[in-house]
């Protein structure tokens, strides 16, 4: 089992990030809970994590800013006494006709998804190397896995596709250091926008539950998964079939 069980999860105040945080806390991990503006929700998540006997605390940062992302990682590592797992969950979503996307909207989606993942991961790598083992799990998107065009969400798909390529490239470079990097790609999740529109189109006819996603994250975090890296695990109920 891991010698160091210390995890930073970005965007972990609510939704998928919250579920991942509580799952890791239930498995004996100390957790740093990141939020940008949802302080009240982050505190609630922290209280729930503490019930598992984990060490837990909240940290505020805008990880689209590289300096803030670096400070977040440093504070997380200092507060936890090290860092071995990073889950990059943060990322905004935009649904707009491609030809009508503004420059500002484009930049926001790329920054909050692809760039934030890069900033946090780059800052975390020295700490994972110090721990002598590490797990990097980045959240993708089912459509991005096969580079499928999806109407009205072009910037989001491009950002998530970039995350997949970045993760694969990084994985190849760091595997000899006992650090793996993988992607979990959800499709429609129980808290997704416009569920009624998406569900009839899914072979499963239902969204993914949070436990189904957290189990996928744990699959990669698990120390027994040390020989699995650069992979994308789609949790989509057959989205791409």
Positions of predicted regions on the chain:
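Conserved glycine-rich cofactor-binding loop
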Residues: 13-14
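The beta1-alpha1 cofactor-binding region of Rossmann-like NAD(H)/NADP(H)-dependent oxidoreductases
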Residues: 39, 60-72, 103, 211
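C-terminal substrate-recognition "lid" of short-chain dehydrogenase/reductases
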Residues: 80, 209-240
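Substrate-binding pocket helix/loop in short-chain dehydrogenase/reductase
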Residues: 97-98, 102-110, 198
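Active-site helix of classical SDR
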Residues: 121, 159, 167
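Alpha-helical segment proximal to the catalytic Tyr-Lys
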Residues: 126, 172-173, 226
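Short, small/polar-rich loop/turn modules that mediate ligand/substrate recognition or access, typified
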Residues: 175, 180, 228-230
């Amino acid at each position: 089992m891991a010698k160091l069980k210390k995890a930073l999860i970005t965007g972990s105040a609510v939704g998928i990030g919250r579920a991942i945080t509580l799952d890791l806390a239930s498995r004996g991990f100390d957790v740093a809970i990141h939020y940008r503006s949802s302080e009240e929700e982050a505190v609630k998540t922290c209280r729930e994590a503490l019930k598992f006997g984990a060490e837990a605390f909240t940290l505020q940062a805008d990880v689209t800013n590289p300096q803030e992302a670096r400070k977040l990682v440093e504070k997380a590592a200092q507060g936890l006494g090290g860092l071995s797992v990073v889950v990059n969950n943060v990322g905004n979503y935009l649904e707009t006709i491609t030809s009508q996307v503004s420059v500002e909207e484009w930049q926001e989606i790329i920054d909050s998804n692809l760039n934030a993942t890069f900033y946090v991961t780059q800052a975390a790598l020295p700490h994972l190397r110090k721990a002598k083992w590490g797990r990097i799990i980045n959240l993708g998107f089912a459509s991005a896995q096969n580079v499928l065009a999806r109407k009205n969400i072009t910037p989001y798909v491009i950002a998530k596709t970039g995350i997949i390529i970045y993760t694969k490239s990084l994985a190849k470079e760091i595997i000899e250091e006992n650090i793996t990097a993988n992607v979990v790609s959800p499709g429609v999740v129980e808290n997704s926008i416009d569920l009624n529109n998406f569900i009839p189109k899914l072979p499963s006819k239902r969204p993914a539950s949070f436990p189904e996603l957290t189990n996928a994250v744990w699959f990669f975090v698990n120390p027994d998964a040390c020989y699995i890296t650069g992979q994308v695990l789609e949790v989509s109920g057959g989205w791409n079939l």
